[in-house]
Amino acid sequence: MTRVVVLGGSGFLGSHVADALKRRGYEVHACSRRTGIDASQEQALTAYLQRVNPHILVHCAAHVGGIAYNAKCPVAIFEDNLLLGYAVVRAACRAGIKKLVNIMPNCTYPGDLDLYSEPMWWDGPMHSTVLTYGMPRKALWVHAWACQQEYGLESIHLVLPNLYGPRDHFDAVRSHALGALIHKIVEARQAETKSVEIWGTGGAVREWMYVEDAAEGIVLATECYNNIEILNLGSGKGCSIRELAGMIRELAGWDGEFIYDATKPDG
């Protein structure tokens, strides 16, 4: 039976990836800080991987939040993800992992793009609001590429759109746009508040993917894709923040109005 370690296996995406792998018959070891494994500690992670001896390592761990959180904690986000990525690639090499599957955010694309196509990944800088998160994740790809050249490390790098679904975060600061909108609108309905403030113009278009679909796509790519060049997972269809807010308002049964703060960045 093929053994797989899922880093961040207690988190939103990682827990669903672990579930999807189990359904396909893999022997799955889901690890995270909750299970006593800090993946940013190279020596401890290497020792764990050498003990479990997995064939495949799926990296879903990250220190991540929404735009407001990125603005509040840029140093911690940058340093934590840089150390995490470095430790994961080094440990994968030292433990003799046969395949590293790295999950990438789509904020690693140039910030001025409306459509994300793999050949455009290196065509410009990331948006400043996500730079401290996106840059360490992009550096992980470079590190993995270097280790392929020197040590023969095999890795794939899958770029995902924004995710939603069971086990998501819904606090106003740490969550991404969809989770934050749900939190604000449901809270407004419960408090009988007549308006909700939304950052940006509402015109920004974002692609969304149900987390269980993302997990199935990751498993399929793990089985079928073997190129270090990035691969997008998604439908290629987007939805504006304004449209999204309207759908949530209707489903929540709230009849208030939205106040868009154009002085803030679009979510």
Where do the PLM segments sit?
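Conserved Rossmann-fold NAD(P)-dependent oxidoreductase catalytic core, especially the SDR/UDP-sugar
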Residues: 86-130, 156
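Active-site Tyr-X1-5-Lys
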Residues: 128-161, 180-191
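Flexible, glycine-rich beta-alpha linker
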Residues: 108-110, 132, 156-180, 204-205
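Conserved catalytic-site region of short-chain dehydrogenase/reductase
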Residues: 67, 102-117, 132-138, 150, ...
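Adenosine-cofactor binding site in Rossmann-like domains, unifying the SAM/SAH pocket
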Residues: 22, 28-47
